[in-house]
Amino acid sequence: TPTCTLEKNNFSIKFYTPTVNIKALVDTMFVAEPETIEWIGEFEKGEIFLDVGANIGLYSLWATVSKGVRCFSFEPESLNFSILNRNIFYNNLVDKVTAYPLAVSDQVGFDFLHLSVFESGESCHSFASNKNFADQEFVPAFSQGSFSTTIDHLVETSMIPTPNHIKIDVDGIENKVINGARKILERPELKSMLIEINDDLPCDSEVKEILKDLGFILTSAPPSVLAPVKSVHNIICRR
């Protein structure tokens, strides 16, 4: 079985690496988004971390192993979800990381997840719309049946505790995730969020205004050195 072990700061995590793409994701984890690693470094043991758009679980596992948080990961794409669970299994984290094969947006219900490419470790998929992170229509390589929930619904039905930290990386529907979390965003237990946004999209400008109005202080990170589009970058929001 192809695996590799990532070691940093006396922590080690075993990842399943069935493809060259996935091996590259693991190998570049600490250089692709250094601000994400730095942000995770602010977490405290026992806090609740919600990872929306977890992919194969790089940040879910790093936060859990390095900071001792309780993590809930959401990844609707079938191939990535399979690898995410294998990574949880390999690291004996079943009590610390729970993964759900769900999209998170502003609706609770069934729809399609439109895939940009049908390969594990890939991203730029879109739930309930075939528009990418640049708001451009694309022809899906595959449309997978999927189910969406909202952050408000998850917390209000006691599926998950109120999160202390949320990462949202969903390639274009970040605004929908925020709109489906309006009640939870007002809770003081929520300390911080990291959200991928596109400066060229009006809906993402709206997201920033909503968060400022709720009392979050926003810090912009530069685009990833690996990012194909330089208007896309992370913002970190702290109370």
Roles of regions detected by a PLM:
Residues 1-96, 136-140, 218, 223-239:
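S-adenosyl-L-methionine
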Residues 10-38, 100-158:
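Glycine-rich adenosyl-binding loop in Rossmann-like folds that engage adenosine-containing cofactors
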Residues 45-46, 67-73, 80, 154-239:
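Conserved acidic-Pro-Pro-aromatic motif
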Residues 50, 72, 100, 147, ...:
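Conserved Rossmann-like nucleotide-binding pocket used by diverse enzymes
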Residues 58-61, 82, 109, 175-179:
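Short N-terminal helix/helix-N-cap motif within the alpha/beta-hydrolase-1
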Residues 89-91, 114-119, 185, 209-213:
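Short, hinge-like loop/turn segments at secondary-structure boundaries
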Residues 93, 104-106, 170, 197:
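Hydrophobic pocket-lining residues within nucleotide cofactor-binding pockets
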Residues 95-97, 162-163:
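Short acidic capping loops at alpha-helix termini that bridge into adjacent secondary structure
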